[in-house]
């Protein structure tokens, strides 16, 4: 691929965004490429900008934001010949980390320029949840409920939520789910259906980050392979402190006798008789009675 026209999509309310850094990035990119810059105004705007970029013949869309905006760009560009690249400006930057991109956005820009000038790009496989692509993770149950709780507290952007609030919300949900009957049923590939309280499907390890520490929910996951699935069959009240420590304190893999783990799956089906929350790449996908998760192989051009 040859990269000449670039669109830089900027989320000005992303957690680590700064105007000074943006100015440096713009200057660096415009020295080698025909650059256009657009700021997002609201949720969903990044997707609209990327769709228009495809129609306009832009070669590469660069997103300077966090994982939520990355997800919008991913969904707009998958299946097209327009490539994407990501520069870190979010709270966790899971996608950027998984690609081995530096967390310093200026350093990451230098890497991007070098690869784009050498026409280096690769095809990335994506997870698909009911027709919605995801780059890093998808969840049904506890983690989706946590994301919904944050969306309710911070409807404009999660950039302003603090780590204490996140941990408090997660703890509240763990305690609330403890002792509950498993009301989900999960079937992984051709396996038998299993009862579940919460299902987490990861494409990366770590699954997410907290205070810079990786939360290793899907420790064998890789962007080069399929779907890794962790399912919690039961959450005993006496197990809540141990699991909370595994999640927030130890950076070790979440494990236990009531936890099922499958590596490199191709299909996950989650069903329930009552609606359950779903999240993709940290944003709520609403309530579902049935969720089918699969893998779309090599559908997105990526420079990174």
Regions found by a protein language model. Name each.
Residues 1-61, 71, 302:
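ATP/NTP phosphate-donor binding region
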Residues 9, 19, 40, 78-83, ...:
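Catalytic core of DAGKc-family lipid kinases
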Residues 46, 68-73, 94, 124:
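Short glycine/serine/threonine-rich phosphate/pyrophosphate-binding segments
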Residues 62, 85:
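Short aromatic-hydrophobic micro-motifs that form the base-stacking/packing surface
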Residues 63-67:
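N-terminal glycine-rich "phosphate-gripper" loop used for MgATP/nucleotide binding
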Residues 139, 143, 200-217, 284:
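Glycine-rich phosphate/pyrophosphate-binding beta-alpha loops
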Residues 154-165, 206-235:
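Gly/Ser/Thr-rich active-site loops/lids in small-molecule metabolic enzymes
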Residues 188, 216-224, 231-304:
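ATP/nucleoside-binding phosphotransfer catalytic cores, i.e., glycine-rich phosphate-binding loops
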